[in-house]
A protein has these predicted regions:
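Alpha-helical protein-protein interaction elements
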Residues: 3, 32, 154, 220-221
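Juxtamembrane segments at transmembrane-helix boundaries
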Residues: 18-38, 46-192, 196-213
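Hydrophobic alpha-helix/TM-entry signal in multi-pass membrane transporters
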Residues: 6-9, 36, 40
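Hydrophobic transmembrane alpha-helical segments in integral membrane proteins
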Residues: 1-19
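Heptad-repeat alpha-helical coiled-coil signal-transmission segments
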Residues: 207, 214-217, 221-228
């Protein structure tokens, strides 16, 4: 897969993100009816729209394929973070993620039109996603709840792995000067792995998020049954 060109990987990532969004939306509407599933599904849908625009780069204006697309990615990841907070029983209010999203949009505007710089854009988007995914990992991993601990570590570990990679990508691109300002023309293992690991994260979330809710629901049923037996 490391030999695939960026555009091909972009289309594959678009497909995996769309499948994740569709799956979570279906579960949210038809099965789960759980409070955390709504932001999970919304976040996956918003991020999926971003990957669609990225895959269409060159066919749509830069305002859509660069600025809007990458802002949607950050907004989608931020919305999923709210879902993770709700799942853990925390308040969903986290203003910092929206300040980060707005700052990312402004920096993308600057490095797209005022001072075109592909490396700077990659640093901005990678750092923003790394920060939010790291926060998601901490929310899921920093819990005393024993229920479905292995699943929480699986999902939290996937977030953490991707956050670490995106942080490395941000740092690496501080020292990389691309030959072309067209992202789809870039090469190198780091840029390729960004898509490969995103596909992996999509599959991890598609499997792990429903299992998290299923485990918590089963535990709640067990607890309710035990309380009922105590009463009688």
């Amino acid at each position: 897969m490391l030999d695939l060109d960026i555009r091909t990987l972009g289309w594959l990532t678009m497909m995996s993100s769309i499948l994740l969004a569709l799956g979570l939306q279906i579960i949210n509407r038809a099965i789960a009816r759980n409070a955390c599933f709504r932001p999970w599904a919304q976040g996956a849908t918003v991020a999926g729209a971003g990957f669609v625009l990225i895959a269409l780069r060159g066919s749509v204006p830069d305002a859509l394929s660069i600025m809007t697309a990458n802002t949607l990615l950050v907004a989608g990841v931020a919305t999923q973070y709210l879902g993770n907070r709700i799942f853990q029983g925390k308040t969903p209010e986290s203003p910092w993620i929206w300040w980060l999203t707005a700052t990312t949009a402004l920096l993308l505007l600057y490095f797209t039109y005022l001072t075109p710089n592909l490396s700077a854009r990659i640093v901005v988007i990678s750092a923003a996603i790394a920060a939010i995914d790291f926060a998601s990992a901490i929310v899921l991993l920093n819990s005393n709840e024993q229920t479905k601990r292995s699943v929480r570590w699986f999902v939290g570990g996937a977030y953490l792995l991707y956050a670490i990679f995106m942080a490395i990508r941000a740092i690496a691109n501080l020292f990389i000067t691309p030959i072309d300002q067209n992202f789809m023309a870039t090469t190198g293992a780091i840029q390729t792995l960004a898509f490969v690991l995103q596909i992996g994260l999509d599959f991890a979330l598609a499997l792990g998020l429903p299992l998290l809710v299923l485990g918590k629901t089963n535990q709640q049923l067990i607890d309710s049954e035990q309380r009922y037996r105590t009463l009688i």
